[in-house]
């Protein structure tokens, strides 16, 4: 059973977050291992496995990028384990430039200001590509959506690096 079916949701990118959370809580109560504490070992193990599946499904569907990756996995794209590299040379150059810019910001005397500007640009790039991905998934353009998700994964990793740098800069001020 796929995660969308498990939660009673249509298999689409745009989902009702409150419905997801409500169904998650219902399933958690229904399959909580404590409810099976006095049952035979086989039933206890089955409830543990079901609870783990429910948790994995919820974490996947809750997170927009993971949800997109999961939708693509249902179409045969295993983005989590692939060695596929992007052939978009313009994007590859953009990646290099963004990483170099972030490295330069870290060494800059006004790093906080530059990092705020960089972070805003990164947020706009992520928003633009996310909108494109939503359109592609909606039109079932799986190959194009997979490429866009690969690019969003890079931007997501870069955002994590920005947050780490912010923490280091904040710690240096303390």
Swiss-Prot record:
Coiled coil (UniProt feature): none
User: What biological-process terms (Gene Ontology) are attached?
Assistant: [2Fe-2S] cluster assembly; protein complex oligomerization; protein folding
Q: Tell me one GO molecular function of this protein.
A: protein-folding chaperone binding
May I have one GO cellular component term?
Answer: iron-sulfur cluster transfer complex
Q: Write down the InterPro entries for this protein, in alphabetical order.
A: DnaJ_domain (IPR001623), HscB (IPR004640), HscB_C_sf (IPR036386), HscB_oligo_C (IPR009073), J_dom_sf (IPR036869)
Alphabetical list of Gene3D superfamilies matching this protein:
DnaJ domain, HscB, C-terminal domain
Task: Write down a Pfam family by its short name.
Answer: DnaJ
Q: Which SMART domains match?
A: DnaJ
Record domain J: where: 2-74
Q: Which keywords accompany this UniProt record? A: Chaperone
Q: Which family does it belong to?
A: Belongs to the HscB family.
Reported function: Co-chaperone involved in the maturation of iron-sulfur cluster-containing proteins. Seems to help targeting proteins to be folded toward HscA.
**Description of how the protein assembles with itself and partners:** Interacts with HscA and stimulates its ATPase activity. Interacts with IscU.
Protein name (record): Co-chaperone protein HscB
Organism of origin is Yersinia enterocolitica serotype O:8 / biotype 1B (strain NCTC 13174 / 8081)
Recall the taxonomic lineage recorded for the source organism: Bacteria, Pseudomonadati, Pseudomonadota, Gammaproteobacteria, Enterobacterales
Encoded by which gene? hscB
